[in-house]
Amino acid sequence: MKPGATGESDLAEVLPQHKFDSKSLEAYLNQHLSGFGAEREATLTIAQYRAGKSNPTFYLQKGFQTYVLRKKPPGSLLPKAHQIDREFKVQKALFSIGFPVPKPILYCSDTSVIGTEFYVMEHVQGRIFRDLTIPGLSPAERSAIYVATVETLAQLHSLNIQSLQLEGYGIGAGYCKRQVSTWTKQYQAAAHQDIPAMQQLSEWLMKNLPDNDNEENLIHGDFRLDNIVFHPKECRVIAVLDWELSTIGHPLSDLAHFSLFYFWPRTVPMINQGSYSENSGIPSMEELISIYCRCRGINSILPNWNFFLALSYFKMAGIAQGVYSRYLLGNNSSEDSFLFANIVQPLAETGLQLSKRTFSTVLPQIDTTGQLFVQTRKGQEVLIKVKHFMKQHILPAEKEVTEFYVQNENSVDKWGKPLVIDKLKEMAKVEGLWNLFLPAVSGLSHVDYALIAEETGKCFFAPDVFNCQAPDTGNMEVLHLYGSEEQKKQWLEPLLQGNITSCFCMTEPDVASSDATNIECSIQRDEDSYVINGKKWWSSGAGNPKCKIAIVLGRTQNTSLSRHKQHSMILVPMNTPGVKIIRPLSVFGYTDNFHGGHFEIHFNQVRVPATNLILGEGRGFEISQGRLGPGRIHHCMRTVGLAERALQIMCERATQRIAFKKKLYAHEVVAHWIAESRIAIEKIRLLTLKAAHSMDTLGSAGAKKEIAMIKVAAPRAVSKIVDWAIQVCGGAGVSQDYPLANMYAITRVLRLADGPDEVHLSAIATMELRDQAKRLTAKI
């Protein structure tokens, strides 16, 4: 069976509530359907399709003849719903001009035959992909499937209504307004509880109708991948199914409906669907829009795109409510109809979020000529959005954020964050600029995110706005890669949502922690618990009021194992008895309030469940290697962005100030600092991008040497650049009027954080000697 092919898995026994008189149907078809009774001895078999939440659909087979029957559901129905006579009419018109639909054969309005109206069409043998990720196909085939689908949609919207003789099939102009009104009424008629988001979304849609609400095209109304039948072997559409919601209206409503999966809320499971991943060969939304517009010969700048996306989610929420309403009445064909009660609200809330977003539906024209490390298409698009967001929202707020911490330096609020940060976070979430660091969530490569990290490095609080701040990024990496399902549910999800923060407890005050095997904090098993005892310091972020969980590295005693197999990582909630925050540690006099400070923490007989252990005993160093690789790339690329900002400040000051009767830049020493800064920035950027590329192509282990090299080179170079910038700015450079003093503290401490330079240099030398030994005949 081909992946996604129709077959036995799509069929089931007829549900009790949908059973009808098969003998009556057979007698009717013998009389009215040509060829149906050709095999007199053959038995009519009937099975019901599992798919479909609205009009029950059945597979009929008599001998070698196969058909599909669609009927109205039994019982009390919502007004103007389930009009299968319209389905039959539009399919007949489309089939007559060669548009890919199943051939409609017979319509019966006599409800005495099987209890409701019904129609019969030919059975089309092909592939239906129930899972939008289309597992089992190559990325190229997957892409071809999506391209063929959107080309078919463009073909539909290019048809002439008059030539189809479908005048009067829909009311015509004013479609969007009618849709909002109709679906509001449909929802209200089916609602079983009050959901404010539905009311708010309905009101927003009615107040933001497109100015041009007079487009009149034939639209499908429920155009999505699992309503398409593809050729058994080719990536070609051979039939479009389920025309129940078709009408004359605005074509962008179909295109938006097809694009829903790009924004589907993570908390809502897509029934019969896998998880959408941008790395899977599925074209981006902008690429599909470009193909659609090219096929129709229209401009790819689509006005009111956010309206149509919001409308689609409003309709989906209304459909979900209708499915659940029919479940309560006992006349729904789906076994999982009860699930729909809980998805109405998140769908409505997603629609509200999309209503506030601004979209560019045009593919960005980015020149990648000469790029050594090429971004993905999505990476290019996200980088453009991040740059715009930084310029429009983050950098203008820098002064306000800085003043907040100056004013609250000695207050109880000093570990909190100004309100503007929360506002910026909500805006970033709405724009889809959230959790960009995690490839499995963002769909970005390490090279993609490295360039984004460079941008966020230009402002000290920018990573936090995008939920890409350390140490949470590393901790989320750990939980994503190594956490159990229970650990992910309890801690990873709220971290990804930005509802809580975390800290990482590794370094200790009583040992040389640059050699991590020295770590003495003990993690001892006691029946179904572990007991933690020890001292930690430089636990970044522990002062944040939202810090709820710590990942602690400690020794699980087993001296029979190698020294790299004696340490483990464990989750410790910050409110666990025995966890005591001792004091904040300053960095060059800065307490780093914004990032939640750096704290000394003592663990005294701290008891946590054994299920809090991550991956297993003795796996601590294994986890550390997986955690630190990406984190070091992020740190180093942010310092590149920081260096760019410092160089900008240096150049601005050098062109503004006069000393000894000439501009500062005219003094050769300053000119040389500027030149040396540019050279250094380009060198460390290339080296860091090479490390990111190695992560993408070789994995963390294959990129070890490059990562160690950037960890030495980047902080060293940038510390010097910031120092030069301070020198050019004079006394102002170390004052609160410029960010340079804070920049220097950040970059200088990076020569210690995640391992001091000397440890990395020793590791680089060892790896280099090993690599050279492979090439030399002499034994080293």
Curated annotation (Swiss-Prot):
InterPro entries with a match to the protein in the record:
ACAD10_11_N (IPR041726), Acyl-CoA_dehydrogenase (IPR050741), Acyl-CoA_Oxase/DH_mid-dom (IPR006091), Acyl-CoA_Oxase/DH_mid-dom_sf (IPR046373), AcylCo_DH-like_C (IPR036250), AcylCo_DH/oxidase_C (IPR009075), AcylCoA_DH/ox_N (IPR013786), AcylCoA_DH/ox_N_sf (IPR037069)
Q: In which tissues is it expressed?
A: Widely expressed with highest levels in brain followed by liver, heart and kidney.
The protein, known as: Acyl-CoA dehydrogenase family member 11
Subcellular location per the Swiss-Prot or TrEMBL entry = Peroxisome; Mitochondrion membrane
Which transformation does this protein catalyse, written as a reaction?
A: a 2,3-saturated acyl-CoA + oxidized [electron-transfer flavoprotein] + H(+) = a (2E)-enoyl-CoA + reduced [electron-transfer flavoprotein]; docosanoyl-CoA + oxidized [electron-transfer flavoprotein] + H(+) = (2E)-docosenoyl-CoA + reduced [electron-transfer flavoprotein]; tetracosanoyl-CoA + oxidized [electron-transfer flavoprotein] + H(+) = (2E)-tetracosenoyl-CoA + reduced [electron-transfer flavoprotein]; eicosanoyl-CoA + oxidized [electron-transfer flavoprotein] + H(+) = (2E)-eicosenoyl-CoA + reduced [electron-transfer flavoprotein]
**Assembly:** Homodimer.
Family membership noted in the UniProt record: Belongs to the acyl-CoA dehydrogenase family.
Task: List UniProt keywords, sorted A-Z.
Answer: Acetylation, FAD, Fatty acid metabolism, Flavoprotein, Lipid metabolism, Membrane, Mitochondrion, Oxidoreductase, Peroxisome, Phosphoprotein
Name of the gene this protein is made from:
ACAD11
- Gene Ontology BP terms: fatty acid beta-oxidation; fatty acid beta-oxidation using acyl-CoA dehydrogenase
Sites where N6-acetyllysine occurs are at 177
Q: Which residues carry this modification: Phosphotyrosine?
A: 324
Named in its record, the pathway it takes part in is: Lipid metabolism; fatty acid beta-oxidation
GO MF terms held by the record: acyl-CoA dehydrogenase activity; flavin adenine dinucleotide binding; long-chain fatty acyl-CoA dehydrogenase activity; medium-chain fatty acyl-CoA dehydrogenase activity; very-long-chain fatty acyl-CoA dehydrogenase activity
